[in-house]
């Protein structure tokens, strides 16, 4: 598979940012469980930002009715970085002996599968509804995660200002991008 120079640069920058997150968290504490918990927290925030960039690129690719290399690149970067986040998260759960609740895990598991598969299949998907399902489902999983933290239902993560910002940015992007897509379809 041919990887463009721009994509390589984005992947390297993304990896370096994830490494910087880990190093900063390593400097904050000497407890490995806490290091990976903090790394997962900040890596997840980075993933949210990249997801919103992907959703932005998708919306404008849809409006222009043409495939965008920026969209494909941002999706590959999102997939790559979100799997680094998954490693941090899995190690945090393991090292901190956090309980695994299968019902809550199912939604996230499906989202991770979609994040892995979608960048590989984006060019093969002809029905627009499947693209919408990807963006809205992954966004809903992000939103549910932040809402759970805000409500205090997430062990090891007290409510923070960023949780409100994260949830608000997801809701705002859903509203804005849905309006843009619907207006375009009316024309």
Predicted feature locations:
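Membrane-embedded alpha-helical bundles that constitute the cytochrome b-like, heme-associated redox core
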Residues: 1-187
